[in-house]
Amino acid sequence: MANQDFLNEINKRRTFAIISHPDAGKTTITEKVLLFGNALQKAGTVKGKKSGQHAKSDWMEMEKDRGISITTSVMQFPYGGALVNLLDTPGHEDFSEDTYRTLTAVDSCLMVIDSAKGVEDRTIKLMEVTRLRDTPIVTFMNKLDRDIRDPIDLMDEVENVLNIACAPITWPIGSGKEFKGVYHILRDEVVLYQSGMGHTIQERRVIEGINNPDLDKAIGSYAADLRDEMELVRGASNEFDHAAFLKGELTPVFFGTALGNFGVDHILDGIVEWAPKPLPRESDTRVIMPDEEKFTGFVFKIQANMDPKHRDRVAFMRVCSGRYEQGMKMHHVRIGKDVNVSDALTFMAGDRERAEEAYPGDIIGLHNHGTIRIGDTFTQGEKFRFTGVPNFAPEMFRRIRLRDPLKQKQLLKGLVQLSEEGAVQVFRPLDTNDLIVGAVGVLQFEVVVGRLKSEYNVEAIYEGISVSTARWVYCKDERKLEEFRRKCSQNLALDGGDNLTYIAPTMVNLNLSMERYPDIEFAKTREH
């Protein structure tokens, strides 16, 4: 029987990620969430990229230059009696693979929508990934300090496009220059908005009760409009149902403005009250419960060079069960070795601290000297592998060339490390000495060349290559696989993990090969 202190620690944890379309305000909301968690005294303004005042969660050099979040940061802070782990994900559309993998390490998600634009395509893609595990979703309709679309239309769009029921928790009163605040439906109170309070926590100005005459004094004719609107909203929308939320079937909807620092506390209250505590995890042999005494965890991301002064890499691990203690012995299942871990890290977006202990739901960082890969499982001796950390087939390809041919060794080392980290995928064709780089979006190519130069002192350039797509190939029959390998060697390559991959010049070529070799499986995704 697990002891009560251990259970209390698990029950306190809330681990979530923010998902949104680029520019819906995700980085701003991350800042404000941290401000409420007292993790930041003054939220970093995201606008001021050139003024040297960078957002706290965008800390890699390239992100600071560009003003976009490229890699996942992890931030832990206390709020309302809970301990919240926020995983910030790349907002830029070219970094979707890293984002997808991060979603495997959380128990719930906050979806941020630009209320002027509604549901956008990146949000649709990310929601598809959360659907793989029926992750509970909290929704924040952002940018109420601008003119927005009709709130009922916005909720209809979420329901129809994303196929999830909406239950409004707060309701906006006006928008843009006329934004007055929100009505909290469950608490029956109006919270009034003050502009110009973006960097400090606003003093809460609350009027209790929708029929309170003080409301008419405070917001004039908007009070009568609100009462009429609420009659309509109550009749037309869903009530919040906690069980449906936990199944990923219904999302509570909050309205506010992250830039104006308004409504963010409502979201955090909702996450602490309703979002699931650390959930059980599937492995290839059994389901692992968080309150099991023995430690287990899996690696969902590898980040190179978090400390520019040191050429190090850190593996981000989600703790799934048991308790991490400094100096403990862990079993690295893939390579079958025991390791002593005395220097795991906790994070506050690039500021590291040594972790004394960690519990299920927490994210810790392990120093990685090249032995840890994405998807690796760590236990206290038991042999199993956590499942559900996917690799996605790249959609774009380039051949990479050196300006200085003598640096081939450094180039390969850099590319292999970057591929293990998940920044890019590397393919080595069986029949040539080419190196092919595959990515989900163009910006990843730029990032790789930039990092090869700054971290490995290698100047590389890209050339176009006629590759349309890649598929990992498997076959239960060794003989048939060997025959396929012999006959199709000009289209085969090994990826960074030495997995056999089919490199298709066109979709027509891929379809023909699939017809010709029905016993070979051509896979779009691969478990790490």
UniProtKB/Swiss-Prot annotation:
<dbReference type="Pfam" id="PF00009">
    <property type="entry name" value="GTP_EFTU"/>
</dbReference>
<feature type="binding site">
    <location>
        <begin position="20"/>
        <end position="27"/>
    </location>
    <ligand>
        <name>GTP</name>
    </ligand>
</feature>
<dbReference type="GO" id="GO:0003924">
    <property type="term" value="F:GTPase activity"/>
</dbReference>
<dbReference type="InterPro" id="IPR004548">
    <property type="entry name" value="PrfC"/>
</dbReference>
<dbReference type="GO" id="GO:0097216">
    <property type="term" value="F:guanosine tetraphosphate binding"/>
</dbReference>
<feature type="binding site">
    <location>
        <begin position="88"/>
        <end position="92"/>
    </location>
    <ligand>
        <name>GTP</name>
    </ligand>
</feature>
<dbReference type="InterPro" id="IPR027417">
    <property type="entry name" value="P-loop_NTPase"/>
</dbReference>
<comment type="similarity">
    <text>Belongs to the TRAFAC class translation factor GTPase superfamily. Classic translation factor GTPase family. PrfC subfamily.</text>
</comment>
<dbReference type="InterPro" id="IPR032090">
    <property type="entry name" value="RF3_C"/>
</dbReference>
<keyword id="KW-0342">GTP-binding</keyword>
<dbReference type="Pfam" id="PF22042">
    <property type="entry name" value="EF-G_D2"/>
</dbReference>
<feature type="domain" description="tr-type G">
    <location>
        <begin position="11"/>
        <end position="279"/>
    </location>
</feature>
<dbReference type="GO" id="GO:0016150">
    <property type="term" value="F:translation release factor activity, codon nonspecific"/>
</dbReference>
<dbReference type="InterPro" id="IPR038467">
    <property type="entry name" value="RF3_dom_3_sf"/>
</dbReference>
<keyword id="KW-0648">Protein biosynthesis</keyword>
<keyword id="KW-0963">Cytoplasm</keyword>
<dbReference type="InterPro" id="IPR053905">
    <property type="entry name" value="EF-G-like_DII"/>
</dbReference>
<dbReference type="Pfam" id="PF16658">
    <property type="entry name" value="RF3_C"/>
</dbReference>
<dbReference type="InterPro" id="IPR009000">
    <property type="entry name" value="Transl_B-barrel_sf"/>
</dbReference>
<dbReference type="InterPro" id="IPR031157">
    <property type="entry name" value="G_TR_CS"/>
</dbReference>
<dbReference type="GO" id="GO:0005829">
    <property type="term" value="C:cytosol"/>
</dbReference>
<dbReference type="GO" id="GO:0016149">
    <property type="term" value="F:translation release factor activity, codon specific"/>
</dbReference>
<protein>
    <recommendedName>
        <fullName>Peptide chain release factor 3</fullName>
    </recommendedName>
</protein>
<dbReference type="InterPro" id="IPR041732">
    <property type="entry name" value="RF3_GTP-bd"/>
</dbReference>
<keyword id="KW-0547">Nucleotide-binding</keyword>
<dbReference type="GO" id="GO:0006449">
    <property type="term" value="P:regulation of translational termination"/>
</dbReference>
<dbReference type="InterPro" id="IPR000795">
    <property type="entry name" value="T_Tr_GTP-bd_dom"/>
</dbReference>
<dbReference type="InterPro" id="IPR035647">
    <property type="entry name" value="EFG_III/V"/>
</dbReference>
<dbReference type="InterPro" id="IPR005225">
    <property type="entry name" value="Small_GTP-bd"/>
</dbReference>
<feature type="binding site">
    <location>
        <begin position="142"/>
        <end position="145"/>
    </location>
    <ligand>
        <name>GTP</name>
    </ligand>
</feature>
<comment type="function">
    <text>Increases the formation of ribosomal termination complexes and stimulates activities of RF-1 and RF-2. It binds guanine nucleotides and has strong preference for UGA stop codons. It may interact directly with the ribosome. The stimulation of RF-1 and RF-2 is significantly reduced by GTP and GDP, but not by GMP.</text>
</comment>
<dbReference type="GO" id="GO:0005525">
    <property type="term" value="F:GTP binding"/>
</dbReference>
